[in-house]
Curated annotation (Swiss-Prot):
GO CC annotation, single: cytoplasm
UniProt source species: Paraburkholderia phymatum (strain DSM 17167 / CIP 108236 / LMG 21445 / STM815) (Burkholderia phymatum)
Role: Aspartyl-tRNA synthetase with relaxed tRNA specificity since it is able to aspartylate not only its cognate tRNA(Asp) but also tRNA(Asn). Reaction proceeds in two steps: L-aspartate is first activated by ATP to form Asp-AMP and then transferred to the acceptor end of tRNA(Asp/Asn).
UniProt GO BP: aspartyl-tRNA aminoacylation
UniProt similarity note: Belongs to the class-II aminoacyl-tRNA synthetase family. Type 1 subfamily.
Catalytic reactions of this protein: tRNA(Asx) + L-aspartate + ATP = L-aspartyl-tRNA(Asx) + AMP + diphosphate
Signal peptide positions on this chain: none
Record site: Important for tRNA non-discrimination: H32, G83
Compartments (UniProt record): Cytoplasm
Designated name of the protein: Aspartate--tRNA(Asp/Asn) ligase
Listed PANTHER family: ASPARTATE--TRNA LIGASE, MITOCHONDRIAL, ASPARTYL/LYSYL-TRNA SYNTHETASE
Entry-linked InterPro entries: Aa-tRNA-synt_II, aa-tRNA-synth_II, aa-tRNA-synth_II/BPL/LPL, Asp-tRNA-ligase_1, Asp-tRNA-ligase_1_N, Asp/Asn-tRNA-synth_IIb, AspRS_core, GAD-like_sf
């Protein structure tokens, strides 16, 4: 018999009476009146092993094993005694009567119990190897594998070719910071780790590969949040000779396929489509969570002449906005709840949170409860009631500031209330999956500090055909052929139709204040390639980490990555990053300069 004949978690009634050889780790050892029970674990699950004292040598070994010992068990599969079955285990109706027990490798005492659900993330990441033995982590990483496998199967069936692109490439600092790699051979010069394979996949379209994909690592040296990592995995795709609509249809179908085949979820037969401007107007976000039923109401125009300066000042400011958020049945919220929400929106730059409780609509002003009502004239109050559709028992929250602050703060409040216990109890949030496409993004954003336009997506995104004329006259009016796929408030993918004509690409560079010499230095290889009959092309990139996080119901993308970094971009397991030897620095012609001490 080989070292292992079956996986522990796959031993069931079909093997009754058969001798099996199992290998795994001791999850738990119990001594019950002279009989020792071992829960043996491998990647497929648990099986109960019974060690009877009749076999003295084997029993003596069993007495010495402890949690996380790596062992081999040989024994016979039998039914568990009546009343001792475990419906929670696939192997719960059987047990293995041990004939032979071999300790393949002992274990020191683990720093924690693997079934402890209250471990700090620091402990888990420091002892990641043990953490990965936990069933939930095993499940998450196998789910990740299945998602990648289904993506490959789907794209292969549609004629896509998996092509690797370079990991050592040229630094083009437009956007997030690059991770730089010094060149020993070319002193004083640096490679950059790719933020995405963007330019290479466009070059592959020019090179007539027609349909490309790869599941690849990307790197961005940016401040980290719960859903960000310095290195992350992208499902990167590009295709030639398809329109924007055809590209969206193709990858919408792929998304449906992957969700159905991996977790059995049937996404909408047709995803909703929403322009960027509508998403910002209704939800204050370009990745709205459509499960939450609350929406903004625009009030800027109605608040221009009120005596309440908190409203009238932003209403009369170029970039100002006044918006309301009606919460059905919110009148039952306590003053403590309101104060808590007020402090919450301050996180997003809001100076405060105005509110009105609707006690009785029919009474007009007299039916409202709020410290701000006295500062609003009748026309403003009528506009609030009519536009929000307020009913008795509701509360209306208001945000008034620069549009970005209003969108960020009221958008965050919308999600907080919707997903709260109050929101769930009052039907303000739906269960399930709500996918949509957000389209018609601005081509450019204006950077006040740099006094120039910057690319809202990236500088290789094509403007809409009817907006080409604005590139040189009014770039702020340009909309892009860009699209994001959003699911339950998470952007899981984004892409665009690309610029495929050299003259248009040069115009975009000029709009970004990238001069001809700088453009040639940074992107000359792309501009040259576009002159050789480049085809119309476009694509998309999905965030594999985010998709698996959502499918697994995990708290963080760190729970679906085998060896992740912390929010300080550190690997607690290997202690990276670390100092390097002075000799290595000399070989790279690098001298370290100590950071200046802050006063």
């Amino acid at each position: 018999m080989s070292m292992r004949s079956e996986y522990c978690g796959l031993v069931t009634e079909h093997l009754l009476g058969q001798t099996v050889s199992l290998c795994g780790w001791v999850s738990r050892r119990r001594d019950h009146g002279g009989v020792i029970f071992i829960d043996l674990r491998d990647r497929e699950g648990l099986v109960q092993v019974v060690c009877d004292p009749d076999r003295a040598e084997m029993f003596k070994t069993a007495e010495g094993v402890r949690n996380e010992f790596c062992v081999q068990v040989k024994g016979v599969v039998r039914n568990r005694p009546e009343g001792t079955t475990n419906a929670g285990l696939k192997s719960g109706k059987i047990e293995v009567l041990c004939h032979e027990l071999n300790v393949l490798n002992a274990s020191v005492t683990p720093p924690f119990q693997l079934d402890d659900d209250n471990l700090s993330e620091t402990t888990r990441l420091t002892h990641r190897v043990l953490d990965l033995r936990r069933p939930q982590m095993q499940h998450n990483l196998r789910l990740r594998y299945r998602v990648a496998m289904e993506v490959r199967k789907y794209l292969d069936s549609r004629g896509f070719i998996d092509i690797e692109t370079p990991m050592l490439t040229k630094s083009t600092p437009e956007g997030a910071r690059d991770y730089l790699v010094p060149s020993r051979v070319n002193a004083g010069q640096f490679f950059a780790l790719p933020q995405s394979p963007q330019l290479f996949k466009q070059l592959l379209m020019v090179a007539n590969f027609d349909r490309y994909y790869q599941i690849t690592k990307c790197f961005r040296d940016e401040d980290l949040r719960a859903d960000r990592q310095p290195e992350f995995t992208q499902i990167d795709c590009e295709t030639s000779f398809l329109s924007e609509q055809e590209i969206r249809d193709l990858f919408e179908d792929m998304t449906r396929h992957v969700f159905k085949e991996t977790i059995g979820v049937e996404l909408d037969a047709k995803f909703a489509v929403m322009p960027y401007s509508e998403a910002m107007s209704r939800f204050g976000s370009d990745k709205p969570d459509l499960r939450v039923k609350l929406e903004f109401t625009e009030l800027t125009d109605a608040m221009k002449d009120v005596d309440f300066k908190v409203f009238s000042t932003p209403a009369n400011t170029k970039d100002g906005r006044v918006a309301a958020l009606r919460v059905p049945k919110g009148g039952e919220l306590s003053r403590g709840d309101i104060d808590s929400y007020t402090e919450f929106v301050r996180i997003y730059g809001a100076k405060g949170l105005a509110w009105i409780k609707i006690n009785e609509v029919a009474k007009g002003r007299d039916g409202l409860q709020s410290p701000i009502v006295k500062n609003l004239h009748d026309a403003a109050i009528a506009a609030i009631i009519e536009r929000t559709g307020a009913q008795d028992g509701d509360i209306i929250f208001f945000a008034a500031d620069r549009a970005k602050v209003v969108n960020d703060s009221l958008g965050a409040l919308r999600l907080k209330i919707g997903h709260s216990e109050f929101g769930k109890a009052n039907g303000l949030v739906e269960a399930g999956w709500k996918p949509l496409w957000v389209v018609d993004f601005p081509m450019f954003e204006y950077d006040e500090e740099e006094n120039r336009y910057v690319a809202a997506h990236h500088p290789f995104t094509s403007p809409k055909d009817e907006h080409l004329e604005y590139l040189e006259t009014d770039p702020g009016r340009c909309l892009a052929k860009a699209y994001d796929i959003v699911l339950n408030g998470w952007e899981i993918g984004g892409g665009s139709v690309r610029i495929f004509q050299e003259d248009v690409q040069s115009k975009v560079f000029r709009a970004l204040k990238i001069g001809a010499e700088e453009a040639r230095l940074k992107f000359g290889f792309l501009l040259d390639a576009l002159q050789y009959g480049a085809p119309p092309h476009g694509g998309i990139a999905f965030g594999l980490d985010r998709i698996v996080t959502m499918m697994a119901g995990a708290d963080s993308i760190r729970d679906v990555i085998a060896f992740p970094k912390t929010q300080r971009a550190q690997d607690l397991l290997t202690q990276a990053p670390s100092e390097v030897d002075e000799r290595q620095l000399r070989e790279l012609h690098i001298r370290l300069r100590q950071p200046e001490q802050k006063a």
